[in-house]
Amino acid sequence: AILIPLYRAICLSFLGNYAPAAEQGSFDFAYTLAQLVTTIQAGFSTYWGPYVYAHYRTEQERIGRIHDLLNLLIFGFFCLLVMFEDIIFIIFPAKSACLPYFPLMMLAVVFSILCEGTVYGNTIARKPFQDTIGTAVGVAANIAVCAVLVPRFGVMGAAVGLVAANATMF
Protein backbone atom coordinates (compact mmCIF):
# COMPACT_ATOMS: atom_id res chain seq x y z
CA ALA A 1 0.00 0.00 0.00
CA ILE A 2 2.93 2.33 0.57
CA LEU A 3 4.04 1.97 -3.05
CA ILE A 4 1.16 3.90 -4.54
CA PRO A 5 1.82 7.18 -2.72
CA LEU A 6 5.60 6.67 -2.73
CA TYR A 7 5.97 6.29 -6.49
CA ARG A 8 3.50 9.12 -7.04
CA ALA A 9 5.39 11.39 -4.62
CA ILE A 10 8.71 10.75 -6.37
CA CYS A 11 7.22 11.70 -9.74
CA LEU A 12 5.53 14.79 -8.33
CA SER A 13 8.76 15.85 -6.60
CA PHE A 14 10.61 15.85 -9.89
CA LEU A 15 7.73 17.58 -11.64
CA GLY A 16 7.74 20.22 -8.90
CA ASN A 17 11.26 21.17 -9.96
CA TYR A 18 10.80 21.02 -13.74
CA ALA A 19 7.15 21.50 -14.67
CA PRO A 20 4.55 24.22 -14.12
CA ALA A 21 1.76 23.69 -11.62
CA ALA A 22 -0.79 22.99 -14.37
CA GLU A 23 1.26 20.02 -15.61
CA GLN A 24 1.65 18.72 -12.06
CA GLY A 25 -2.12 18.89 -11.63
CA SER A 26 -2.65 17.16 -14.97
CA PHE A 27 -0.30 14.35 -13.93
CA ASP A 28 -2.07 14.00 -10.59
CA PHE A 29 -5.50 13.87 -12.26
CA ALA A 30 -4.39 11.18 -14.73
CA TYR A 31 -2.83 9.20 -11.90
CA THR A 32 -5.96 9.41 -9.76
CA LEU A 33 -8.18 8.46 -12.70
CA ALA A 34 -5.98 5.46 -13.49
CA GLN A 35 -6.06 4.40 -9.83
CA LEU A 36 -9.86 4.07 -9.98
CA VAL A 37 -9.29 0.68 -11.59
CA THR A 38 -7.76 -0.53 -8.34
CA THR A 39 -11.06 -0.11 -6.51
CA ILE A 40 -12.43 -3.08 -8.46
CA GLN A 41 -9.29 -5.04 -7.72
CA ALA A 42 -9.42 -4.11 -4.02
CA GLY A 43 -12.96 -5.41 -3.74
CA PHE A 44 -11.99 -8.72 -5.32
CA SER A 45 -8.86 -8.97 -3.14
CA THR A 46 -11.04 -8.86 -0.05
CA TYR A 47 -12.23 -12.32 -1.07
CA TRP A 48 -9.25 -13.58 -3.08
CA GLY A 49 -6.47 -13.03 -0.52
CA PRO A 50 -8.04 -15.07 2.28
CA TYR A 51 -9.06 -17.77 -0.21
CA VAL A 52 -5.50 -18.12 -1.54
CA TYR A 53 -4.04 -18.34 1.96
CA ALA A 54 -6.65 -20.90 3.08
CA HIS A 55 -6.46 -23.16 0.01
CA TYR A 56 -2.96 -22.81 -1.45
CA ARG A 57 -2.01 -26.40 -0.53
CA THR A 58 -5.14 -28.12 -1.81
CA GLU A 59 -6.27 -25.87 -4.70
CA GLN A 60 -3.01 -24.82 -6.37
CA GLU A 61 -4.17 -25.70 -9.88
CA ARG A 62 -7.44 -23.83 -9.46
CA ILE A 63 -5.70 -20.82 -7.93
CA GLY A 64 -3.27 -20.79 -10.85
CA ARG A 65 -6.10 -20.89 -13.41
CA ILE A 66 -8.02 -18.12 -11.67
CA HIS A 67 -4.84 -16.05 -11.37
CA ASP A 68 -4.17 -16.45 -15.11
CA LEU A 69 -7.78 -15.55 -15.91
CA LEU A 70 -7.57 -12.46 -13.70
CA ASN A 71 -4.37 -11.38 -15.43
CA LEU A 72 -6.08 -11.76 -18.81
CA LEU A 73 -9.13 -9.79 -17.62
CA ILE A 74 -6.96 -7.02 -16.19
CA PHE A 75 -5.00 -6.73 -19.42
CA GLY A 76 -8.24 -6.78 -21.43
CA PHE A 77 -9.71 -4.03 -19.24
CA PHE A 78 -6.53 -2.00 -19.74
CA CYS A 79 -6.86 -2.39 -23.52
CA LEU A 80 -10.52 -1.32 -23.42
CA LEU A 81 -9.75 1.76 -21.34
CA VAL A 82 -6.96 2.78 -23.68
CA MET A 83 -9.18 2.19 -26.73
CA PHE A 84 -12.00 4.29 -25.28
CA GLU A 85 -9.95 6.88 -23.42
CA ASP A 86 -11.25 9.60 -25.73
CA ILE A 87 -14.69 9.13 -24.17
CA ILE A 88 -13.23 9.72 -20.71
CA PHE A 89 -11.74 12.99 -21.86
CA ILE A 90 -14.96 14.03 -23.58
CA ILE A 91 -16.49 13.83 -20.11
CA PHE A 92 -13.53 15.78 -18.66
CA PRO A 93 -12.57 18.14 -21.53
CA ALA A 94 -10.50 20.42 -19.30
CA LYS A 95 -8.25 17.46 -18.48
CA SER A 96 -7.51 16.45 -22.08
CA ALA A 97 -3.87 17.49 -21.61
CA CYS A 98 -3.27 14.11 -19.95
CA LEU A 99 -4.47 12.17 -23.00
CA PRO A 100 -0.95 11.52 -24.39
CA TYR A 101 0.35 9.86 -21.22
CA PHE A 102 -2.83 8.37 -19.74
CA PRO A 103 -2.09 4.93 -21.28
CA LEU A 104 1.24 4.91 -19.43
CA MET A 105 -0.55 5.69 -16.17
CA MET A 106 -2.92 2.80 -16.83
CA LEU A 107 0.00 0.49 -17.61
CA ALA A 108 1.61 1.40 -14.28
CA VAL A 109 -1.64 0.43 -12.53
CA VAL A 110 -1.76 -2.88 -14.43
CA PHE A 111 1.75 -3.74 -13.22
CA SER A 112 0.76 -2.81 -9.68
CA ILE A 113 -2.31 -5.06 -9.79
CA LEU A 114 -0.39 -7.97 -11.32
CA CYS A 115 2.23 -7.62 -8.60
CA GLU A 116 -0.35 -8.49 -5.97
CA GLY A 117 -0.37 -12.14 -7.05
CA THR A 118 3.38 -12.26 -6.57
CA VAL A 119 3.00 -10.80 -3.10
CA TYR A 120 0.64 -13.64 -2.11
CA GLY A 121 3.10 -16.21 -3.45
CA ASN A 122 6.05 -14.63 -1.64
CA THR A 123 4.13 -14.56 1.63
CA ILE A 124 3.09 -18.19 1.29
CA ALA A 125 6.68 -19.17 0.45
CA ARG A 126 7.80 -17.18 3.50
CA LYS A 127 9.95 -14.90 1.38
CA PRO A 128 8.39 -11.46 1.93
CA PHE A 129 11.87 -9.92 1.85
CA GLN A 130 11.65 -10.31 -1.94
CA ASP A 131 8.76 -7.83 -1.94
CA THR A 132 10.91 -5.36 0.01
CA ILE A 133 13.74 -5.80 -2.48
CA GLY A 134 11.31 -5.32 -5.37
CA THR A 135 9.98 -2.15 -3.78
CA ALA A 136 13.48 -0.75 -3.21
CA VAL A 137 14.54 -1.52 -6.77
CA GLY A 138 11.29 0.05 -8.02
CA VAL A 139 12.03 3.24 -6.06
CA ALA A 140 15.56 3.33 -7.47
CA ALA A 141 14.21 2.87 -11.01
CA ASN A 142 11.63 5.60 -10.46
CA ILE A 143 14.25 8.06 -9.22
CA ALA A 144 16.72 7.21 -11.99
CA VAL A 145 14.18 7.43 -14.82
CA CYS A 146 12.63 10.63 -13.46
CA ALA A 147 16.06 12.22 -12.98
CA VAL A 148 16.92 11.54 -16.62
CA LEU A 149 13.57 12.07 -18.36
CA VAL A 150 11.59 14.68 -16.38
CA PRO A 151 13.97 17.60 -17.05
CA ARG A 152 13.75 16.93 -20.80
CA PHE A 153 10.23 15.53 -21.30
CA GLY A 154 8.29 16.86 -18.30
CA VAL A 155 5.09 15.00 -17.48
CA MET A 156 5.72 12.29 -20.08
CA GLY A 157 9.06 11.55 -18.39
CA ALA A 158 7.33 11.27 -15.02
CA ALA A 159 4.76 8.87 -16.50
CA VAL A 160 7.57 6.71 -17.91
CA GLY A 161 9.22 6.81 -14.46
CA LEU A 162 6.00 5.58 -12.88
CA VAL A 163 5.75 2.69 -15.35
CA ALA A 164 9.43 1.85 -14.80
CA ALA A 165 8.92 1.72 -11.04
CA ASN A 166 5.89 -0.56 -11.22
CA ALA A 167 7.36 -2.77 -13.96
CA THR A 168 10.61 -3.17 -12.03
CA MET A 169 8.72 -4.01 -8.85
CA PHE A 170 6.65 -6.59 -10.75
Task: State where each predicted segment sits.
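Membrane-interface helix-loop junctions in multi-pass transport and translocation proteins
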Residues: 129, 136-170
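Residue-level recognition of transmembrane alpha-helices
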Residues: 28-31, 70, 102-105, 109, ...
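Membrane-interface junctions at transmembrane-helix termini in multi-pass inner-membrane proteins
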Residues: 54, 107-137
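Helix-loop junctions and terminal segments of transmembrane helices
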Residues: 30, 34-60, 64-71, 119-124
